[in-house]
Design a protein with these regions (language model features):
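C-terminal membrane-solvent junction of multi-pass transporters and transport-like membrane proteins
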Residues: 131-134, 163, 371-376, 417-474, ...
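Loop-to-transmembrane helix boundary motifs in multi-pass membrane proteins
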Residues: 1, 133-137, 252-274, 356-398, ...
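Membrane-interface loop-to-helix entry segments
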Residues: 134-200, 240-243, 264-270, 406-419, ...
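A generic transmembrane alpha-helix motif of multi-pass inner-membrane proteins
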Residues: 36, 168-171, 175-177, 182-183, ...
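TM-loop-TM module centered on a large, flexible mid-protein loop between adjacent transmembrane helices
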Residues: 67-74, 111-112, 199-218, 264-344, ...
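Hydrophobic transmembrane alpha-helices that form the core helical bundles
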Residues: 26, 46-54, 58-143, 148, ...
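Membrane-interface "cap" regions at the ends of multi-pass membrane proteins
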Residues: 1-35, 45-50, 194-200, 500-501
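Hydrophobic, membrane-embedded alpha-helices of multi-pass small-molecule transporters
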Residues: 2-21, 138-145, 199-286, 326-348, ...
Length: 501
């Protein structure tokens, strides 16, 4: 994998298609500003990203967070933190990637074709992809295809990643164009036409606006600084993954280069943050502030009139309504389909590398790290992770309470990022030889290593982000179930420390 491939890998991993911020934030946080919240999340992630740059150049090995933490804090801590927060919880991302593929990919494709071609049958097919078993079938096939691709050789994934990258960029660019070239007035008419062509009732836009007002939803709330600050943790669900390429550092050419890692990690963060903020600005420009809160109410408050055929009004659906063209629908959908497929691939790539590193340190069974003589890939690790994902996919789609914890993965993975940032801060003191031989050792502020400064700031910022999820109900993780899951994760962590090194 070249540095450029790693750079686009991180952008795809952060997910240009991730939709939650655009509906969750206006629904749960009236008065918050989407664009500023996303930009704040990007700024807050910078010190964490920089800590990963220093760690990656000091330890350019596959295994990422586990390697960083275990070499600074010891194998027991590294194993328990990364196993509980990453290896186990990223199984949730396997389920999420299937949801993204089925709901935002295939469902949007057929809903869009139904609306632009005036074919209610296609619309009905699209609705099926939003049902639990529709999503389950797509999710398992998605995970299986990713496993087969990766087992065939990492180079095959890298080649296909370029297809996913350019398709996603084209899709994203088209959406920006459609939104920036529209006005709320033209949007209202085109949305109404789109819904009628799909077999729906006329005047969808006006009906939704009136229903929101009838439900006492403020469609033009005053600016709220607190709400804007709370948008940042939602956007962080995407931007926190800027450093994910570190899991396969050993397979990135020039991974020890400080400049390369700055581009791969920090560069991908800034590009993704700016693109997501641009989409937020374009989205609100096209549909208007009033309808933004209607769409948010459909997602957060369950406003029935704020949905289209029971489907939330995601940016890609509304872009298709604006386009009115089956060709544009296919192009936008293809980007979403391929970026969703990339998500499950990165789950396997990152976690199999972590599992192999743990196995080589004798913290997982030896068979986990066996590499196929013919395929030159860790087949056993891939197969184990695929099988482990199936029950998670089933629970995610069949148990509504678990679905409510969709982004609980942000909390669990968040504490991994915090501990890794601390590992960066303490590396000059607890792993002196490693740090002294690294390119980053030359950068100091006075006598204080810069990685210590960035690592401490990053750990503090990450801690604040995680605590916001725990204490603000608008972020969705204050239920009894959420605390039970968090407690179980902590018990798993504590159990892991007792494993022999």
């Amino acid at each position: 994998m070249s540095p450029y491939s790693a750079f686009i890998y991180n952008i795809l991993t952060m997910g240009l298609i991730f939709p939650w911020t655009y509906l969750w934030a206006p629904g749960a946080l009236p008065g918050g500003r989407l664009v500023w919240g996303i930009l704040l999340a990007m700024i807050f992630e910078i010190p964490i990203a920089l800590a990963y740059v220093w760690l990656s150049t000091a330890l350019p090995r596959s295994g990422g967070d586990y390697v960083f933490q275990s070499r600074v804090f010891g194998g027991g801590i590294g194993f328990s933190i990364v196993m509980s927060g990453f290896v186990i919880w990223i199984l949730q991302w396997v389920a999420l990637s299937g949801w993204l593929l089925s709901y935002l990919g295939f469902a949007s494709l057929f809903l869009g074709l139904g609306g632009t071609m005036g074919n209610p049958t296609l619309t009905s097919i699209g609705v099926w992809f939003t049902t639990p078993w529709g999503i389950i079938i797509v999710s398992i096939l998605n995970a299986l295809l990713a496993m087969l691709l990766l087992v065939s050789g990492f180079k095959n994934y890298v080649k296909f990643q370029y297809v996913m990258w350019y398709a996603t960029l084209l899709s994203f660019g088209l959406m920006l164009y459609l939104f920036f070239s529209a006005t709320p007035e033209t949007f209202a008419q085109k949305l109404n036409d789109f819904v009628v062509a799909s077999g729906g009732a006329p005047n969808f836009y006006e009906t939704a606006i009136n229903a929101a007002k009838g439900a006492n939803i403020d469609l033009n709330p005053p600016f709220s600084l607190l709400a804007t600050l709370l948008v940042a943790p939602i956007a962080w669900t995407s931007l926190q993954w800027a450093s994910y390429s570190a899991q396969q550092n050993g397979e990135i050419k020039g991974a020890r280069s400080f400049q390369n890692q700055l581009v791969i990690i920090l560069g991908s963060l800034i590009v993704t943050g700016l693109l997501l903020a641009a989409l937020a600005a374009a989205f609100e420009h096209a549909i208007g502030t009033n309808f933004l809160y209607v769409a948010g109410a459909g997602y957060w408050a369950g406003l029935a009139e704020g949905k289209f055929n029971g489907v939330f009004l995601w940016p890609n659906i509304l872009a298709m309504a604006l386009a009115g063209s089956p060709i544009i629908v296919v192009i936008i959908s293809l980007g979403y389909i391929l970026n969703a497929f990339q998500i499950v691939n990165n789950c396997y790539i990152g976690m199999t590398r972590v599992m192999v590193a743990m196995s080589l340190d004798r913290l997982l069974p030896e068979w986990v790290s066996r590499v196929s003589d013919r395929l030159h890939t860790p087949v056993n690790a891939h197969l184990a992770y695929f099988l482990a994902s199936i029950p998670v996919i089933l629970v995610y789609n069949l148990w509504g309470q678990w679905t409510a914890l969709t982004l609980g993965v942000t909390f669990a993975c968040g504490y991994v990022f915090i501990v890794t940032a601390l590992a960066g801060a303490l590396m000059p003191y607890r792993a002196k030889a490693l740090y002294g031989a690294s390119p980053g050792a030359a950068y100091k502020v006075g006598s204080i290593p810069m990685v210590t400064i960035f690592g401490l700031i990053g750990a503090l910022v990450g801690g604040v982000m995680v605590l916001m999820f725990m204490f603000y109900s608008a972020l969705g993780l204050t239920s009894v179930l959420a605390y039970q899951v968090g407690s179980a994760s902590w018990r798993c962590r504590s159990f892991g420390i007792s494993w022999p090194e």
